[in-house]
Every structure is written in structure tokens, then in C-alpha cells.
Amino acid sequence: MSQHIRKLDSDVSERLKSQACTVSLASAVREIVQNSVDAHATTIDVMIDLPNLSFAVYDDGIGLTRSDLNILATQNYTSKIRKMNDLVTMKTYGYRGDALYSISNVSNLFVCSKKKDYNSAWMRKFPSKSVMLSENTILPIDPFWKICPWSRTKSGTVVIVEDMLYNLPVRRRILKEEPPFKTFNTIKADMLQILVMHPMISLNVQYTDKLRINTEVLFRSKNITEGLTKHQQMSQVLRNVFGAIIPPDMLKKVSLKFNEYQIEGIISKMPVGLKDLQFIYINGRRYADSAFQGYVDSLFQAQDFGEKGMSLLKTKSVGKPYRSHPVFILDVRCPQTIDDLLQDPAKKIVKPSHIRTIEPLIVKTIRSFLTFQGYLTPDKSDSSFEIVNCSQKTATLPDSRIQISKRNQVLNSKMKIARINSYIGKPAVNGCRINNSTINYEKIKNIRIDGQKSRLRNKLSSRPYDSGFTEDYDSIGKTITDFSISRSVLAKYEVINQVDKKFILIRCLDQSIHNCPLLVLVDQHACDERIRLEELFYSLLTEVVTGTFVARDLKDCCIEVDRTEADLFKHYQSEFKKWGIGYETIEGTMETSLLEIKTLPEMLTSKYNGDKDYLKMVLLQHAHDLKDFKKLPMDLSHFENYTSVDKLYWWKYSSCVPTVFHEILNSKACRSAVMFGDELTRQECIILISKLSRCHNPFECAHGRPSMVPIAELK
């Protein structure tokens, strides 16, 4: 290999750059549909052939002339801008002249287009020149794709992308191995962004199977009229794209204005198990700061958002084993800057130019919502988060009949989509006023930094299971002493006796870590609970590995799920089967499907006890955990010739066990363990400590609380 610096061949350079700009089928679909929107299309149809990494987009936009078609997909050729300052007032998605150029370098691209009142349509198979489309023209594309001729008064464009990444085989193989639901969910999120900004566009997305025999509707834009308010349109768009993931009356309107900044959106009153339905748009572009998104979600978690719904379930859970997140769409409008448009090829905003104003306003909107819903009490001492205070006089907003009361925010509970309205700024409008000093970005920034530092400290201070860690405060010197106890220490100990019918006092004799023996107090309930929990996990995984897992047939157990959830269950059906959970998905409407539960493991059947809401929650939790890699698939292939389970290291597979099984086994171990107040003989104490010393993680009970604490050094 030459050691001299040389310019890359143009072919290699183009492939590398194109792969960076267009890395997936979903991103290519997004770029083409955005081009259709820029062409003022009112109807857009998308057909996706995922197995072949191909798709087609049909629109009724203004179309292309022959001359424009011949220079289409040429790098840095665009009709959107002429000079840099044009970006400030630009209203279109595209402007770089890069998207089609990149797609054409990694796929077979075909475009056919017609301008209104032109006699002819023109087509082009890249990189060839355009030719006229006639009845006798043989189309240079797969016969699966259909092109209907336009009448003289009509216009439109058809873009067909075939065999994406055909010249990048490794990247193509990786893309083809990606689960279909992930690609479809990405497309849904991208199309939602377009429809939130352009709700009146009729956007229909379909996909075909591997044999191209059957086609399914991914989603269809419908029931959007000009008579709906913006917030009602948002609610319907969300339902159209992601299905009936949340009832419409559970979405509340929020609205806030401060000088040139305005936020309008919807927030759900009830949570869902999916965190992916949280969208913030700034001037129509997705805000992609994951740190801030996490901070916003933490505002809800800190107030136990959704706990009211959990309390309504007939089946109760100990602690908070199941995650829940709000659904929200926030549309932020502010002065547009060139810097915001140049941050990401996918047209996302990573760090907005007006971040010092936008982020505090978003936080204020969230906290106002939480306050009105009763989750949060206004903290007047924290000016960066204080809620907008309105005067006692009532006033009528110009765009509604809602009256502002003495309350911090306004909500009209008579409407299905209620409203929270506030105006911030000088002079006061409708009796609402707040000083600019309350928009304090630095406090939010510090909170985010503190949160990141806290997470880092937790990672750095985490200990492996073979050691326990505690802090002892010296009341005289006011110092902290670190004690580290390994499992090997527990192999050499002496049981002294039971203490107060609650604890077992032991003396650890191993001096390899400490220079002198230690007195350790062991929680007898936590000790027995840990022993029983590990025995239960070993038994459970042994049954799964050996195929002796007991499942019970169910009848008439159907659960309604939305289409997005149905796709998730379809993909992980075989994984659920390993745990004795058998089901079939039944296609329903465009918004909902049915999950027919066929079998459940015996332990889950007893816990479920007819509570379908609880069952849906725990099944969705595991599906989302698998999707987010919080749980790993249970690989049983290397157990096919497994004859002995004596050496089954169960802890290696604990990350595969569904959360609901963890909950059930934790509860079972807790209820059957020795309790506080139970009197134990010294021999019984010896047996307990002996079993604890053989546990994989002897330092925690089933719920994560410490099972022992060092109390003294015997010097």
C-alpha cells in the first residue's frame, strides 16, 4: 500500500459520501417525500419493498421540465436557494442539492415527471439522459412498479429507488438484517414530522411482502380538515401514523408565547410504555438533543407520572418494575438562523441557536402541564421554573372562548382536547406577565450537567457481584471509611448468634483484605430472601433450558393493541414462545389490532388472574425491553445437547428473563423467607449463612437492599 497522500478515486469518494448522507431505506424515503412536499404536492403515495430495499414515491406536485430533469441529482444543484442569506427565509426542507445525488450513487434511480399543461411527460433512468414517455415506451424498471399517464391538466412526479446499497454489499447485508418494525417506526417518525407541519397533505404509505403478492397499509393520513384546530390536527395526525396508542381525550393542549417565541403542542395525561413518542420540533425540524430529551422525561418521572393509572389496575406490583413515559408533540416557533439549518444532513437540530430561551420555555410548558394535572406544586422560590402567574381578572384569548382565571394556566375540561394557555413577556397580554429574568437557561444547564455527573458516578462506583460496598461514618473524626467484602470472606466466618430476632451476627476471619477480623450484621430476612430468589431463578431457567416449562392454555383472552405494538409483537413472537407465552396477532382496523393470547406460563396465569390491562402492560414491557436491548433474546441453540443442568450458570441469563418474571420471583422469595421476629437457633443461623455464602450475589436482597453491613473491626 502506498504511503503517499493521494486523492481518492471519484467513484470511491462518491460512494463514501453517499453512504454518509443516505444510510438507510428510511432516510431515503424521508428525503424523497420531503422533495414532494417542497414541490407543493397535496397527495403523496409511498410503496415500500423492504425485502429488496426498494421503494416508490408518487406525488401530484408541480413536476419537472425536461431540462430540469436532465440536471436533477447533480451535486450542489438546487432550485431552493441562490445565496447564503436565502437560508434565513427558506421554507423548504431541501436546499443542499445532495439528497438525490447521494441516493443515485448507491441505488438504481428512476424519475418520471410532468408539468401542468405540458403535452408530454419525461422519464430518466440515471445516469442516462431523459426521454419522452409514450404508450410504447418500455420502462427500464421492474414491472412491479406502475406508472399511470397524466392528463394534460395534471402534474406530478414518480421517483423509484431500486436495490439500495447494491454497490456496498456489507452495508446492504446489515440493512437487510434489521428488523422490519424498526425501519417502519423510523419512517413513521419521519412522516409524523412532515404531517405535523403540513397536516392537510394526504400521505399514504404501503408495503409489500417478499413475493410481492400482498400489500399492507402502514398508515394513511385521514380525518384531517381545516375546521380542526392545530392541536386537534396534531392529535389526529399522531393517531393516523402510530395508531390508537392513546385515546384522543387523553391528549391535552399546551400553548405558550414569549416575545418572538411560541410553543404549541399536545401532552398525554396517561403514560405509555414506549419512550419513542416524544417529539420536539423547532421551526419544523426535529430537536435531537438526547440529553435534553432525557431531562424532559425525568421531569415526568420525578413526579410519578402515570402512577394514578397503575393504582387502578386490579393486579398490584411492588415498587416500580414497569416503565412509563408521556407522549408529547411540541412545535416550537422562533426566529430562524442559518446555523440551525447546517447542523445535520438529516435536517435535525442538535444545538439550537436560541437554546438559552427555548429550553427554559419548554421546561416551563412541561411544568405548567404537570401543575395543572396535580402532579406538581408551583415552587415560587425557583424563578427559573415558576409558572406563569395571571392576574385575578379574567380575560378572553383572541383565538378561543376560554377564560383565564386566577389559576396559573388555563384548561377547558369541556373539550376533548383541553387547553393550557399562557403568554409571557412585556407588555402583559390578557393579564399574564413574567419577567425576562425568569427564563434562566443556566439553571437548566447546571441541572443537566449534575445529572450527567451523577450517572457517571453511579457507573464508576458500581461493583461486581463478588464484592459488597458500604460507607461507615466515624462519629469522632467525621471521616468516611470504605469497606469491601468479597465472597471469599464469607467462606471463612464464625456465626455468633441471632440478634433481636432480626439479625445474625457473624465474625469474618479472612484477613486478606482487612488486617483484622470484621464483625458483620446480616439481615436475616434479606439473607433468606436472596437464597430463595437464586433457587427460584435456577429452577426457572432449568425448566426453560430443558423444555419442561409449564404453560397453560387460555380461552377468550384477546387484548386490543395499536398497529405499532402489533408489529412489535409479530417480530418477537418466537422469543415470547420460549417463556411459555403464545399468541397470534389478528389484523383489525387501520388503528388497532387484536392480540389473542393462546398460552401463558402457570406463574403468570396466577398473577394475571383475568386482569387484561395488567397483562398487556407486562407483555409490552418485555417487547419494548427487547427492542431497546434492555433485555436480550434467550439463545437456546447451544443447549440442544445439554444433558446436565448442574453447571447451569443462571446469572448469565438473568438479563433474558422478562421483567414480570423478576417481579413474580422477587415477591415469591420475599413472602416465603424468614421474617423479622422469627426466632432462629444458632444452628439455623449457621445453615442460612452457609447457603448465603454460596449465592452468586449475597450482598443484596431480592429488591436490591443490602443484606449485611460491617459494624466493627476487631483490632
Curated annotation (Swiss-Prot):
GO biological process: meiotic mismatch repair; mismatch repair; reciprocal meiotic recombination
InterPro entries per the UniProt record, alphabetical: DNA_mismatch_S5_2-like, HATPase_C_sf, MutL/Mlh/PMS, MutL/Mlh/Pms-like, MutL_C, MutL_C_dimsub, MutL_C_sf, Ribosomal_Su5_D2-typ_SF
Alphabetically ordered keywords of this record: DNA damage, DNA repair, Nucleus
Chief localisation class: nucleus
Alphabetized Pfam families for the sequence: HATPase_c_3
SMART domains reported in the protein's UniProt record: DNA_mis_repair (SM01340), MutL_C (SM00853)
Any GO CC annotation of this UniProt entry: MutLgamma complex
Subcellular location: Nucleus
Recorded GO MF terms: ATP binding; ATP hydrolysis activity; ATP-dependent DNA damage sensor activity; mismatched DNA binding
Family assignment from sequence similarity: Belongs to the DNA mismatch repair MutL/HexB family.
PANTHER family: DNA MISMATCH REPAIR PROTEIN MLH, PMS, MUTL (PTHR10073), DNA MISMATCH REPAIR PROTEIN MLH3 (PTHR10073:SF47)
Function text: Involved in DNA mismatch repair (MMR), correcting insertion-deletion loops (IDLs) resulting from DNA replication, DNA damage or from recombination events between non-identical sequences during meiosis. Component of the MutLbeta heterodimer, which probably forms a ternary complex with the MutSbeta heterodimer that initially recognizes the DNA mismatches. This complex is thought to be responsible for directing the downstream MMR events, including strand discrimination, excision, and resynthesis.
Subunit details: Heterodimer of MLH1 and MLH3, called MutLbeta, which is involved in correction of a specific subset of IDLs when associated with MutSbeta. Forms a ternary complex with a SGS1-TOP3 heterodimer during meiosis.
Protein name, per record: DNA mismatch repair protein MLH3
Organism for this UniProt entry: Saccharomyces cerevisiae (strain ATCC 204508 / S288c) (Baker's yeast)
